[in-house]
């Protein structure tokens, strides 16, 4: 701002000086013109023709001068604008230089910060290198220790596992052998048990059969004895009846021969019917009974035959009503037949009840057998080891049940067949037996005798056989039971031992399995630890690789930063050298700026005086215009007057012509002075147009002829050594990579066409101009 004020004050001072100089020149010209006008008035009037021509020339010259003045004024205004623009450009250049210096300072600060960062990074890198080396060393030590521990633990565990495996294999082999032996023993024991059970069942069945046979033999003996007694009684009765019949036959053989035959036939038929009824009832009873035998059937038949013979042999009793003897006999026979039917019905009902009781017993036994089968099945489910034996037993029991049921059905069918056969046989044999009754009585007597003898023999044999069989059976059963009990005890002891051994083996197997499980868990834990350690090692290796990568990146950055630092240091060296040159130039520039400021002040004063002169000249030019116009009017009037008074006043015309010629001479003088002033203005134009180019650079200026450089410093001044004619531009690139300032060449040729006298006369000091090449400085 102070500089602008100074420049504006210098300009105003120079303009005032220029105006004052112009006014002085006008004042000098005016007395000269007055003096010349007075001299011209004295001249002759012969110059009137020349005056007209001169007036025309003056008009033309005035026009040309007016045009030149307008052009000069336009040039002056344009040059003022250029001066303002050059001042702005100089200010901008100074601001750019300040910015460049600030950027240089910032770059220095950044370089210092980068140096600090690089130092910190170097420290960190060195620290990280040491830490990495320590980590790697610790990792290697830990890895080696862990590998050694793992190897030792694995070797120990493998040895322990091998020893335990060998021991377990031996134990397993022993247990397998023992189990095989035990299984063989168990199979043999099971087979022996099965054989013994089969033997027991067979002996039990034999005992049951023998007991049944004994009971049957006793029952047969009892029935035989009873039948013998009944037969003896019946034989006695038959003998008595036979005697009676013989007596009756002898007494009434002749009289009742025909009737007796009819009655015998009727009674035989009736007896046949009653006998058939009784035999039918007896057959029904035998069909329903399950334990009837052929011997009992024959005894019953014998009893029935005896009853029929007794009924047939009843004597005929005559009735008082005039009935014959055979009719009374038939009536007497019907009554006991009805009684016999009732008794047979009672017997049948009793037998039916007995059969129902037996059926209930059989059903109860069947239920018991089924319950036993169920119990056996439950025991088979509970006792898995004896399942085969129990299943075989249940199968055998079921087979026995099926066999019993089949035998039962076969017995039923046989009983039915026997009964049917017996019925048919009885029906067929009744007729023959009735015919053979007489012959059979004799045979019966013989048979009774034989039977008595056989009975005695049988009783003796039965007693002997019973005693022997019972003794043998009891002895054999006792011995077999003792043997079986001993075997069962031995087998039970063996089973207990085997169970104890089995429990021991199970406990050992459990212990071995627990040991194996613990060893497996330990192995799994070791494997897990190994995996964890491997994972940790992998993580550490990954971290190491990442740290190595970061270290390499930091190294690269460090190398790049070192390269940048070297470049920056080189650039700083160059900048320092340039700064030294700038500092050297600074003093020169300051001294020159002081001189230039003094010259500028003087020249600004001169410019002001020139401006004042220009104003005065303009004022004088306006006055001259007015005078010229007035003169033209006067000339026109004078011509008119001269035309009117050519003959009257020739003397007056000559005087007027002389005055006009003097005025013309004065005008010519003023025009000459104006031409000189215009020439001085033309010199100003030449100075302004022919001034050298001064391109400003941010970093420095180098000269071409004398190798002298121009630099801009902080005091916003230009410095040079010996006023070189021209300063050629040089370019320098900024040292830092982040910011670069474009350098512009500055050239400052000084024109030597005019001398120092002309410069002082013009009153211009340093003038800045701007063109395509840069800033121009004219002195």
Swiss-Prot record:
Residues 1-55, 253-274, 315-336, 718-764 are annotated as: Disordered. InterPro entries: FPP_plant. Keywords: Coiled coil. Residues 47-200, 337-674 form a coiled coil. It comes from the Eukaryota. Residues 1-14, 256-272, 718-731 have a biased composition (Basic and acidic residues). Residues 324-336, 733-752 have a biased composition (Low complexity). The keyword Coiled coil applies. It holds the Pfam family FPP. Interacts with WPP/MAF proteins. Belongs to the FPP family. This is Filament-like plant protein 1. It comes from Arabidopsis thaliana.
């Amino acid at each position: 701002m102070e500089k602008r004020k100074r420049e504006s004050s210098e300009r105003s001072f120079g303009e005032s000086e220029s105006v004052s100089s112009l006014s002085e020149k006008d004042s000098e010209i005016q007395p000269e013109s007055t003096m010349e006008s007075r001299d011209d008035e004295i001249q002759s009037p012969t110059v009137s023709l020349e005056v007209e021509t001169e007036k025309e020339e003056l008009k033309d010259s005035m026009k040309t001068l007016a045009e030149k003045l307008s052009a000069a004024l336009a040039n002056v205004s344009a040059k003022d604008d250029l001066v303002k623009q050059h001042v702005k450009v100089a200010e901008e250049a100074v601001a750019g230089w300040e910015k460049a210096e600030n950027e240089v300072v910032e770059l220095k600060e950044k370089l210092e910060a980068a140096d600090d960062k690089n130092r910190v990074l170097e420290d960190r890198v060195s620290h990280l290198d040491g830490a990495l080396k320590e980590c790697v060393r610790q990792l290697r030590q830990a890895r080696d220790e862990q590998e050694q521990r793992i190897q030792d633990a694995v070797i120990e565990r493998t040895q322990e596992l091998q020893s335990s495996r060998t021991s377990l294999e031996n134990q397993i082999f022993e247990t397998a052998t023992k189990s095989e032996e035990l299984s063989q023993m168990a199979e043999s024991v099971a087979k022996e048990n099965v054989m013994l059970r089969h033997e027991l069942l067979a002996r039990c069945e034999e005992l049951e059969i023998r007991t049944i046979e004994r009971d049957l033999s006793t029952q047969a003996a009892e029935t035989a004895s009873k039948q013998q007694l009944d037969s003896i009684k019946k034989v006695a009765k038959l003998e008595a009846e036979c005697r009676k019949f013989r007596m009756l036959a002898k007494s009434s053989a002749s009289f009742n021969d025909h009737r007796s035959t009819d009655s015998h036939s009727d009674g035989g038929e009736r007896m046949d019917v009653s006998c058939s009824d009784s035999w039918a009832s007896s057959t029904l009873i035998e069909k329903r009974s399950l334990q009837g035998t052929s011997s009992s059937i024959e005894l019953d038949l014998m009893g029935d035959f005896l009853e029929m013979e007794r009924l047939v042999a009843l004597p005929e009793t005559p009735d008082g009503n005039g009935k014959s003897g055979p009719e009374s006999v038939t009536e007497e026979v019907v009554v006991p037949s009805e009684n016999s039917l009732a008794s047979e019905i009672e017997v049948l009902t009793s037998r039916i009840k007995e059969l129902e009781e037996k059926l209930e017993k059989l059903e109860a036994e069947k239920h018991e057998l089924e319950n036993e089968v169920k119990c056996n099945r439950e025991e088979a489910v509970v006792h898995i080891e004896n399942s085969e034996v129990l299943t075989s037993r249940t199968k055998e029991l079921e087979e026995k049940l099926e066999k019993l049921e089949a035998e039962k059905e076969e017995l039923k069918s046989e009983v039915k067949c026997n009964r049917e056969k017996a019925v048919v046989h009885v029906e067929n044999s009744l007729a023959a037996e009735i015919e053979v009754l007489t012959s059979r009585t004799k045979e019966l007597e013989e048979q009774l005798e034989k039977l008595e003898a056989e009975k005695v023999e049988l009783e003796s044999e039965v007693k002997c056989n019973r005693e022997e069989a019972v003794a043998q059976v009891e002895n054999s059963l006792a011995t077999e039971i003792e043997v079986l009990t001993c075997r069962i005890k031995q087998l039970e002891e063996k089973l207990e031992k085997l169970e104890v051994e089995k429990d021991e083996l199970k406990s050992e197997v459990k212990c071995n399995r627990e040991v194996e499980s613990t060893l497996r868990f330990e192995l799994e834990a070791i494997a897990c630890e190994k995996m964890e350690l491997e994972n940790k090692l992998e993580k550490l290796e990954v971290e190491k690789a990442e740290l190595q990568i970061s270290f390499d990146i930091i190294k690269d950055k460090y190398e790049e930063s070192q390269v940048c630092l070297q470049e920056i240091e080189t650039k700083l060296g160059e900048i320092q050298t340039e700064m030294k040159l700038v500092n050297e130039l600074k003093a020169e520039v300051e001294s020159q700026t002081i001189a230039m400021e003094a010259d500028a002040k003087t020249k600004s004063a001169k410019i002001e005086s020139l401006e004042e002169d220009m104003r005065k000249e303009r004022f004088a030019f306006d006055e001259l215009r007015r005078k010229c116009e007035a003169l033209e009017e006067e000339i026109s009037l004078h011509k008119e007057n001269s035309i009117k008074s050519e003959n009257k006043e020739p003397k007056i015309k000559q005087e007027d012509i002389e005055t006009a010629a003097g005025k013309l001479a004065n005008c010519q003088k003023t025009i000459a002075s104006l031409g000189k002033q215009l020439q001085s203005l033309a010199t100003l134009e030449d100075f302004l147009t022919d001034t050298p180019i001064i391109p400003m650079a941010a970093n420095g200026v180098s000269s071409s002829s004398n190798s002298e450089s121009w630099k801009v410093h902080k005091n916003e001044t230009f410095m040079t050594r010996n006023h070189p004619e021209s300063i050629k531009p040089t370019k320098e690139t900024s040292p830092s990579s982040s910011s670069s300032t474009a350098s512009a060449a500055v050239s400052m040729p000084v024109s030597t066409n005019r001398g120092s006298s002309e410069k002082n006369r013009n009153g211009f000091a340093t003038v800045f101009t701007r063109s395509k090449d840069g800033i121009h400085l004219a002195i």
